Amino acid sequence: MYVIKKDGTHEEFNVQKIITAVNKSAARILYTFTDEELQFLCDFAKDKAESLKKEGITIQEMHNIVEGALEAVNPAVAKSYRDYRNYKLDFIHMMDDVYTKSQSIRYIGDKSNANTDSALVATKRSLIFNELNKELYRKFFMTRDELQACKDGYIYIHDQSARLDTMNCCLFNVGEVLRGGFEMGNVWYNEPKTLDTAFDVMGDIILSTAAQQYGGFTVPEVDKILAPYAMKSYRKYKEEFAKYADPSWTNVEAQAEKYARDKVKRDCDQGWQGIEYKLNTVGSSRGDYPFVTVTLGLGRSEFEKLISISLLEVHREGQGKAGNKKPVLFPKIVFLYDENLHGPGGACEDVFEKGIQCSAKTMYPDWLSLTGEGYIASMYKKYGKVISPMGCRAFLSPWYERGGMKPADENDEPVFVGRFNIGAVSLHLPMILAK
């Protein structure tokens, strides 16, 4: 006995193919057959096929036999099997929906996300692909119960257009990437030797890597990352001044230090200005302006404080035409507040004052207390580790160096930088409680 395929070719009757097909259908509704149920399905299908007394059975007849066997064992799996069998017809309807949405995006635009400018061709392509990806996710990945729960409003699965491909938000370890150089695309980047180059390279890294995820991209404690490159520039400018200074000048050393500090301050201001322009004008390959956050404020050294103060001043001034400057959206700034550092007489009180001035005018930075109450503060107090937000509101739970989810011992420490989270699902708790 053989099965006649859709293309007219013949294939020997094989119960193993039935087992494979029914297991796939069962998996779609999170059901697992027992060995006895699988044996029943195989015996049922074989007996039914033989009862037809035909040498060749069409694939349509075989589908009907398997469907009948599944109805006898588990009607829900039978429905899953039937749905999958008819997926080509469903696919046509799905593509029709995607086409309708694509026409709307092309000729009307899309205003659902302020970070995506649907007037741009690259963004139109991305939005259309997202519509297709969302339909594929709903059709071939979500279970029937999940679809129904979403439809009824009990849950909401975020970012359905992207969550199958990559991760959501991350705390990117820019400092580790810069250190020693790295490869991006087909080009090797050497470690920056000056602050202005470090700003340029950091901007390239952000645009490239933020496009490989769909959530918020955070550069944690950026003041500490850039400070070593500020020191390199400082030394370079001092040597430059000494090279051209007249030995007869008085206080040459003091003049060299002032010259170097002024140049580093200018590099800082221009570097942050360049970052702001880059992140708000150059769309990523994902078709949007990436949601980039930087955290700062804990650096105590001269150049760490300079980098923080410079960003706060640049953001406070805004970008645009003279007389019509406006603060930009990205990078979002989060000030890491430590009462002992930033309170009256603290080592970083001056940074705090600049943050207050910036916040009063632009509503940035956001403020994250590390010495108050709650989870974030408790981790900082116990381990001295900062949990920067990923994007605007996602905070990682601890992962310990040796113990994983739980500390191996009292000396085990949590790791946050260099980690990410997966897609979010919102629960409608009042509806769930009422149910």
Regions found by a protein language model. Name each.
Residues F91, D97-K435:
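Conserved catalytic cores of very large enzyme subunits
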Residues M1-R106:
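Charged, amphipathic alpha-helical regulatory modules used
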